[in-house]
From Swiss-Prot:
The keyword Transferase does not apply. It holds the Pfam family Atthog. The chain crosses the membrane at residues 7-29, 68-88, 101-121, 139-159. The keyword Transmembrane applies. It is found in: Cell projection, Cilium membrane; Cell membrane. It is a multi-pass membrane protein. InterPro entries: Mosmo (IPR037663). Acts as a negative regulator of hedgehog signaling probably by promoting internalization and subsequent degradation of smoothened protein (SMO) present in the ciliary membrane. Plays a role in sonic hedgehog (SHH)-induced spinal neural progenitor cells differentiation. This is Modulator of smoothened protein. One of its GO terms (cellular component) is ciliary membrane. Glycans are attached at residue 135.
Amino acid sequence: MDKLTIISGCLFLAADIFAIASIANPDWINTGESAGALTVGLVRQCQTIHGRDRTCIPPRLPPEWVTTLFFIIMGIISLTVTCGLLVASHWRREATKYARWIAFTGMILFCMAALIFPIGFYINEVGGQPYKLPNNTVVGSSYVLFVLSIFFTIVGLLFAGKVCLPG
């Protein structure tokens, strides 16, 4: 197993962890209002009213966000399989070729999720339009983690494909 394979494996693992954290954290969209802060995630929606304890419930997702969640979960599975194949490539060199293609599939799934997610900004809790959030609403830390997972997946693919050679 060469250094580039190890580097790409670490990048894929980091992307996998960031994607899992983005789903687990309910901060994809944040209203940040002082009276009642609302954070909307793909698996939980949390609200804090006038300094009381934060209350979380499962959200009613629009079809666009269900599709986004599906693509992210499939991308996570792809990156997990990729990491396993990169470990297996220590004994069977041809596993690297399959790992690259599965990681590429994961990247496509993540990019599709990133394109589809903003279409769901029209829901009542957010109050925006497709691809346009209202002025008082911002994307939260979960979305940033998800974008980082896309970035690490792309850089990992560059190393796995030996496109990005050091020195």
